[in-house]
Amino acid sequence: ALRKIIGGGEFVGWFQTFVCFVIMVYYGAVLAWGVQYTIYSVNEAWGGDPTSFFLESFLEKVPGNTFSWAPAWSVMIPLALVWVLVLLVIGRGLSKGVEAANKIFLPLLIVLFLALVVRALFLPGAVEGLNAFFTPNWAALADPKVWLAAFAQIFYSLSVGFGIMLTYASYLKPKSNLTGTALVAGFANSSFEILAGIGVFGAVGFMAHQQGVAVAKVEGLTGPILSFVTFPQIISMMPGGPIFGVLFFSSLVLAGVTSLLSLLQVVSGGLQDKFGWSPARSALVFGVPATVISLALFGTRSGLNNLDIVDNFINSIGVVSSAIMFAVLCAVAGPRLGALRAHLNSVSSVKVPKVWEPLVGIVIPLVLFIMMAMSVVDLVTKGYEDYPGGYVMVFGWGAVAIAVIAALIFTFIPWRHRTVDTHATVTQVLADDADAIASTEGDAQ
């Protein structure tokens, strides 16, 4: 799509594609953890020490922040099964695969999660948890890292800035109601996130109540520790814990599967467009190496360490830089934002105001660049957490470098699939819409 608008845009498109590739390679491991913990929830297999069970018995984590090729079979086996499942779905194509799967998984996810939230709200101490959830921490807003993490999270959550929404948008009919659809998607996503927060903090409030401490004193509220240590501990404390556990981890798996399918569709769609391959062939070509890499790096005893580093770098640098390049490309190198806004207003029910242009073309890219630059300087000078420099170089900077190098290679590979040169058509459509809007505004004045 970006290649058709401007020649240099193809690199940005492939960079987004390989950012998705890197994310999906490690994201499958989180799904594998969720699958196993859904089973473990039946009899609360973690016992009285969820931390030791997760790190030692389940992940078989190596001591310290080191690397190991040794497999962790309790992770590797379900991880292999996850990859087989999602590749079979992607191989069936968009309508028979991704769309059909989402018609099952998304309604089921909503039902399970609603049951989970209702259960959490009636736990002792849930109100204290909700008070903590809805009370702003104004001091934290002064930290640029918080804003960068928030941008990366909302980009990932809304699937914007790194290819997913662009891929799905390419399947829309011409003259679709773009802003109306975008508002529905954004509202639905934010509503579900608030619902998730209510459920999580209701459960955390219960845990604080049981321990006789304030919610702020509860440890393990970030990253994998929240889902796989803190929540099992909460599950063990509450009446009907196994039922709550199955609901929670089933919801986690279903949400993860739908996210992983969207990441896979970006890569599959890119290969289909570039080489004219079928969905099945595309799934095989990228699925086999993705599965091998995923098993070799994240199905091992150092899988948690590897995931932690790659996730931090590819989100705070890869996803954010992708969003910056995309915004700049649309604002400067491609069709001007004024013409794009006019086109959006000509086909959509909700009109885009003029302030959208400087926000998307100048303010947001500039703010993102400044925050990302500060984060990069911090990572270069201080490193990441307590990991050795070489470890961070390979899995952190290396993950970003792989996305850049792969994007360059695929940009220069000749297209083997006949494409329609729509640059003139796109430009003309935008120009016509801009003229029509300008004429209408002039008549109104």
Which residues are covered by each model-predicted region?
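Hydrophobic alpha-helical transmembrane segments of multi-pass membrane proteins
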Residues: 15-26, 81-88, 148-159, 247-258, ...
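Hydrophobic alpha-helical segments and their helix-loop junctions in multi-pass secondary transporters
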Residues: 27-52, 110-134, 205-206, 293, ...
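Terminal cytosolic tails of multi-pass membrane transporters
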Residues: 331-354, 382, 389, 394-445
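C-terminal membrane-solvent junction of multi-pass transporters and transport-like membrane proteins
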Residues: 17, 275-287, 314-396
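Transmembrane alpha-helical segments of multi-pass small-molecule transport proteins
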Residues: 4, 14-17, 48-91, 159-166, ...
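Inter-helical loop and helix-membrane interface segments of multi-pass membrane transporters/permeases
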Residues: 1-15, 30-91, 95, 127-148, ...
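Membrane-embedded translocation segments of transport machinery
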Residues: 99, 103-261, 271-285, 289-290, ...
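Juxtamembrane interface elements at the cytosolic ends of transmembrane helices
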Residues: 1, 80-97, 101, 113, ...
